[in-house]
From Swiss-Prot:
It comes from Mycobacterium tuberculosis (strain ATCC 25618 / H37Rv). Phosphorylated and dephosphorylated by MprB. This is Response regulator MprA. The modification 4-aspartylphosphate is found at residue 48. The gene is mprA. Monomer. Interaction with each conserved 8-bp repeat requires tandem binding by two protein monomers. Residues 4-118 form the Response regulatory domain. The lineage of its organism: Bacteria, Bacillati, Actinomycetota, Actinomycetes, Mycobacteriales. Induction: Autoregulated. Differentially up-regulated under different stress conditions, such as low concentrations of detergents and alkaline pH. Induced by low concentrations of sodium dodecyl sulfate (SDS) in a SigE-dependent manner. In strain ATCC 25618 / H37Rv, repressed during growth in macrophages.
Length: 230
């Protein structure tokens, strides 16, 4: 069963962006638009983790944290806020949040922080089983190790995030805009060839010993991870 995450934010665009990104990475996602709705949903069907905005109507994120912790609930909580100051971070952590991420943020970082939160609440054997595989390509989001057969591949953060998205969606064509939004975040470049450059980097590294190509271009659309060209 996939991990269930409740996303709570009064900004619909943020909610939908997080829903798409988390769903693409294998999570089951539910949405709430404020703290009152979030607490009701948690009480009726507790999720595995919570992504929680601070500034919301009716009941803000910090009060949601306080109420949950006040009942002894240890639900993993990642707090989002538009204010990036020491006092704001301290307030969030003191209210009971496990981690803190200022807006705007790269979706890659949010996904990494969510994995870290879930690792801290799962037994070691569960964390060790998170390796993703396609053909002879293996990517482990916990250890951040990548292998092609027995060959270890060293990747930068952006290369890793791009490959992780592709391997999480095998044989599924991913549009250029979808990849840019998820890997580069909300402020992704709308022009230039950054994506093409990084796809080239990944191809060179994953094919360095003459292995067959796995990352294919779908002309006019985007890219796909598959054994043969589309």
């Amino acid at each position: 069963m996939s991990v269930r995450i409740l996303v709570v934010d009064d900004d619909r665009a943020v909610r939908e962006s997080l829903r798409r990104s988390l769903s693409f990475n294998g999570y089951s996602v539910e949405l709430a638009h404020d703290g009152v709705e979030a607490l009701d949903m948690i009480a009726s069907d507790r999720p595995d983790a919570l992504v929680l905005d601070v500034m919301m109507p009716r009941l803000d994120g910090l009060e949601v944290c306080r109420q949950l912790r006040g009942t002894g609930d240890d639900l993993p909580i990642l707090v989002l806020t538009a204010r990036d100051s020491v006092s704001e971070r301290v307030a969030g952590l003191d209210a009971g949040a496990d981690d803190y991420l200022p807006k705007p943020f790269a979706l890659e970082e949010l996904l990494a922080r969510m994995r870290a939160l879930l690792r801290r609440t799962k037994p070691e054997d569960a964390a060790e089983s998170m390796a993703m595989r396609f053909s002879d390509l293996t990517l482990d989001p916990v250890t951040r190790e990548v292998n092609r057969g027995q060959r270890r591949i060293s990747l930068t953060r952006t290369e890793f995030a791009l490959l992780e998205m592709l391997i999480a969606n095998p044989r599924r064509v991913l549009t250029r805009s979808r990849i840019l939004e998820e890997v580069w975040g909300f402020d992704f470049p709308t022009s230039g060839n950054a994506l093409e450059v990084y796809v080239g980097y990944l191809r060179r590294k994953t094919e360095a010993d003459g292995e067959p190509r796995l990352i294919h271009t779908v002309r006019g659309v985007g890219y796909v991870l598959r054994e043969t060209p589309p």
